[in-house]
Amino acid sequence: MELRSALQSVCRTTAAAASASARSSLAGRHAFSTSARFQLQPPPNPYVSGKSRIETLRAALSNRKPAAGAAAGGSPGATSASSALPPRPPTANDSPWSIVDAINKDSNSSTSSSSSSSSSGGALYSSSKPSPMQTWNETDFETRHMAPQQELNIRLRPSTGRTFYVSGHQDFAGALKLLHRTVAANKVKKDVRLQRFHERPALKRKRNLRERWRARFKEGFKAAVNRTFELKNQGW
């Protein structure tokens, strides 16, 4: 019985100690998280206006003493350090082209120091020259850099002579004359007249025979006349 009571007292003591440590740890964690939550600061504002940046840079440049570099001596290191200073920030009264002119000046000075031949090619667009966006012409760009689109001539049926393609060296009047000549050679008017009215098969057969005999008579007559002139030229 004494051993049993001793074991029970030891178990009670161990359980009480474990529960007390757990409560203290929970309270400490809660107190730590609460204090940490109260200690959090609001995040800084990442946005800084351009005007404030310009004012800060201007104040930093004004606080610098340019005489310190000159007192160090005329060494090349001092000149390079002075040339490496950032440019003066633009003010509200400066024109937008002042920055471009400054860039042109810097590029010209760098190219002229490296080689005299490339000094003229380093300039960008200045205020005296128009901007490339001001002189942009889409039609002129397409005519100079894009191939002209070829018109598709799809021949799904025999040509009727109603279309005539005019080249660049031909005028409108000459094109109309060539069109009328092509229409007459293809007998377009005759075909249109025959298509407008219905023609009986017997009349069509007679017309074809008549036209065939007329064409043969015309060709035979021309051949006889040509033969006569050939014999006359030969001295007969």
Swiss-Prot record:
Subcellular location: Mitochondrion
MF terms (GO), sorted A to Z: structural constituent of ribosome
Ribosomal protein is among the record's keywords: yes
One Pfam family named in its UniProt record: Ribosomal_S21
Entry's Gene Ontology BP terms: translation
Protein name as catalogued: Small ribosomal subunit protein bS21m
Entry GO terms, CC: mitochondrion; ribonucleoprotein complex; ribosome
Gene from which this protein is expressed: mrp21
The keyword Transmembrane helix belongs to this UniProt entry's keyword annotation: no
Positions in coiled-coil regions: none
The family this protein is said to belong to: Belongs to the bacterial ribosomal protein bS21 family.
Source species, domain of life: Eukaryota
Biased composition (Low complexity): 107-131
Keywords for the protein's UniProt record, in alphabetical order: Mitochondrion, Ribonucleoprotein, Ribosomal protein
Residue span of region Disordered: 65-136
Function text: Component of the mitochondrial ribosome (mitoribosome), a dedicated translation machinery responsible for the synthesis of mitochondrial genome-encoded proteins, including at least some of the essential transmembrane subunits of the mitochondrial respiratory chain. The mitoribosomes are attached to the mitochondrial inner membrane and translation products are cotranslationally integrated into the membrane.
InterPro entries: Mitoribosomal_bS21, Ribosomal_bS21
Subunit record text: Component of the mitochondrial small ribosomal subunit (mt-SSU). Mature N.crassa 74S mitochondrial ribosomes consist of a small (37S) and a large (54S) subunit. The 37S small subunit contains a 16S ribosomal RNA (16S mt-rRNA) and 32 different proteins. The 54S large subunit contains a 23S rRNA (23S mt-rRNA) and 42 different proteins.
